[in-house]
From Swiss-Prot:
Residues 100-112 have a biased composition (Pro residues). This is TBC1 domain family member 10B. It comes from Homo sapiens. Residues 716-782 form a coiled coil. It comes from the Eukaryota. Gene3D superfamilies: putative rabgap domain of human tbc1 domain family member 14 like domains, Ypt/Rab-GAP domain of gyp1p, domain 1, Ypt/Rab-GAP domain of gyp1p, domain 3. InterPro entries: Rab-GAP-TBC_dom, Rab-GAP_TBC_sf, Rab_GAP_TBC_domain.
Amino acid sequence: METGTAPLVAPPRRHGAPAAPSPPPRGSRAGPVVVVAPGPPVTTATSAPVTLVAPGEARPAWVPGSAETSAPAPAPAPAPAPAVTGSTVVVLTLEASPEAPKPQLPSGPESPEPAAVAGVETSRALAAGADSPKTEEARPSPAPGPGTPTGTPTRTPSRTAPGALTAKPPLAPKPGTTVASGVTARSASGQVTGGHGAAAATSASAGQAPEDPSGPGTGPSGTCEAPVAVVTVTPAPEPAENSQDLGSTSSLGPGISGPRGQAPDTLSYLDSVSLMSGTLESLADDVSSMGSDSEINGLALRKTDKYGFLGGSQYSGSLESSIPVDVARQRELKWLDMFSNWDKWLSRRFQKVKLRCRKGIPSSLRAKAWQYLSNSKELLEQNPGKFEELERAPGDPKWLDVIEKDLHRQFPFHEMFAARGGHGQQDLYRILKAYTIYRPDEGYCQAQAPVAAVLLMHMPAEQAFWCLVQICDKYLPGYYSAGLEAIQLDGEIFFALLRRASPLAHRHLRRQRIDPVLYMTEWFMCIFARTLPWASVLRVWDMFFCEGVKIIFRVALVLLRHTLGSVEKLRSCQGMYETMEQLRNLPQQCMQEDFLVHEVTNLPVTEALIERENAAQLKKWRETRGELQYRPSRRLHGSRAIHEERRRQQPPLGPSSSLLSLPGLKSRGSRAAGGAPSPPPPVRRASAGPAPGPVVTAEGLHPSLPSPTGNSTPLGSSKETRKQEKERQKQEKERQKQEKEREKERQKQEKEREKQEKEREKQEKERQKQEKKAQGRKLSLRRKADGPPGPHDGGDRPSAEARQDAYF
C-alpha cells in the first residue's frame, strides 16, 4: 500500500497487555500511521499526557508474517520524549486497501504495540482548553479537571466548521485483503482513533494502558470488507509565552514542528473562521465549485473558474468555449503593436481598434487596454503620488461608514472579495474613499462599488482609481451624483429608443406603467456587472471603453427586445409583477456572449441618435421639472472622443527655437520669466580691417558661424506697437461689423420697398378691377332705363303691347 510514504500497519494488542518494541522493516521510512480497521472510523479525544517521539528516532510498526520482517532484529529503544498535554485535529482519509498479506494475529497475552511515528504532517493545533470552532471530526476536549480520571477517553459531539478538513467517502476494498479489527492508533497529542469495536483511549505513561470500559476489542480476522483509514496525527505545539500565536500555524507542509509567525496580510485561524463563516456557509450550498482539499489559513480552498469565481450565478465552470492558443497569441501581438503607436491608431485607424474591441480584448492585456482606451494611463502619469495623498487624507465619516458596510456585498463569490478584511476589500475601500475626497461634490454612490470591484479584478488599486475617475467623469457623467438626475434622463432617452427598437415591448411597458428607472438603473449604473454572465460582462466592458455609453443602450435594448418583444413572451407577463419578475430573470440565450455581441453590433443606435433624443428629453425635462440641479460635464462617446478632447486641451506650441536664439527675444523672454535680462550684444569698434559680419548666438552654443544677412536688428515690435496693432484690428473689426449691419439694413429696406411696390401693384389691380365692375353696372342700368328699341327703330314690339292689340 503506497500513500506517498511507507505505510505502517499496526498489529492488534490485547487489553491490558504491555507495549513491546517492534522491529522496523528494512527500507521503511517515517510516514503517516496506517490503521487497518473494518467499519466506520471512530474519533475520540483525550487530554491525558502522551509520549512524543522526536523526528528521526521513531520506530515504525512492522507487519507480522511479511517476508522482510520474518526474522526481525532487535532495535535500540528510542529516547524518551517530554510529555505534552494538548489536543489536535486528526484528519482521516479513507482509501481502498491494496493487496496485502494476511496479518497473523498473536495468540499470546502480549502483542507488540505500534510505535509513534516521527515526521508526520503538521496540522493546525489548538491549545488545551481553548475555545475552538465546531468541527465535524473532532473538537478539542477541555483539560482534565481534578475529578476527571486521566485515562478516561471523552467523546465529543461534532459539527461542521468552515475550513475543517473532513474525511473522504470510503472506497470499495479489493477482494482478498485481510485485516484485523479493533486496531487502535495513538496520536502524539492524546487523540486516539480506533476502528469498529475498539473504543479505548490509550495513555503513554510508563507503558501502561488504562482500563478499557468497552472490554477487549480484538475481533476476528478474515477478508476485508471495510476501507483502510490513513490517520494523519499532529502533535500539539509546545507551550509558549504567548498562546495567541497558536491560531496562526499553517497546514501547508509536512514536518513543521513548531508554531510559525502570522503573515502580515493573513488572518489567524480563529479570525478567518469567525469572519468568513457566513460566506462559506452560503458557498457550501453551491456544489458546482467543490473539489479542492488544500488549505490557506485553515480554510479549505475551492475550485474557481478562470475568472476567480467560487460559485454563484456568475460562475462559468468549464462549459465556455475557449479561443485557440495561436489565435490568442496573434491577437496579443496586434494589441501590443497598437499600444506602441496608440495615438496614430486612434486618430487614423479607429475603425480597426473598434473592430478588435468587439472581437474581445485578450485577457492578458485587458487591464492595459482599458487604461489606454479610457486615457486613465495618461491621467495617472500626470498625477504621480495623488492617489497616495488622497489615501492618507481623512475622509468624510458619513461616506466611510456607508462604504464599509457595502464592502462585503461586492462579489462575495469571487476569491478576491470572499474574505472579510482581505486584500480585495481593503483595496476597494481605498479606492472608494479616495474618490469621495477627489470628488467631494459627488461623494459616494453604492453603484460605484461593483464598478470599482470589476476594475480591481484586473489592475492594481491606483490604476483602478484613475480608471474609475474616467468612467465617472467622461463616460457616465452625473450617474453617481446626488438625485440621480442623469440616470433618470437617460431612462427617458432609453424609453424613446425602445419605441424604435421594439414597439411591442414599448407598448407593453407603457400599458403596465413601468417606469424605466425600475429596471434599467442597475443595468446602466453597474454597466451590467451584476446582470450578465461574466464572459458577457467582459465583452460588454471591452466595447464600452471603446465606443462609450451607446453600448449600454444597445445591450439594454437587446435584452428587452428578446424578453418582451414577441406575443408569445408577453403571454406570461399579464401584470406588472409578472413583467418585473421576467426582467429580473432574463433568458439565458440573450445573455450568451456571442449572441449578445452579434445583436449589439447590428443594432442601429448611434451617438447622433442618442444626442438628438437627449436634447429632446432635456427640453421636456425643463418644461415639466425645471432646470437640472446637477450639471455634469459633457458626455464623451468612447475613446476617440476622449482622445480628441485631450488634443484640444493641450497647450499651444511655444515659439520656435530659431526665434528664441536671437538676442532681443532672449532678453524679453528672460524678463518675462522673471530672470535677469541678458546683456546687450557688444558694440564692435571700427578697425582698419574689414568689419566681420554679425553672428548668431544660440542657446548653449558659441558664436561661430556668420549670419547670412547683414541685419542684426531683433525681430518683433514694441508693446506700444502691438497695442496699436490690436487697437487697429479691433477698429477694423468694428468697421466691418458696422458695414455688415448697414448692408443688412440696406437689404432690409430694399426688401421693404419691394414689398410696398408689390402691395401698391396689388392695390392698383384691385382698383382697376373695381372700376371695371362699376362701369359694367352703370351700362346695365342705362340699358334698363332706356328700354329695348321700338319697331320703327327696327326692333320687335313688346309682348304686352302685342297682347293688348290682340285683346281689343
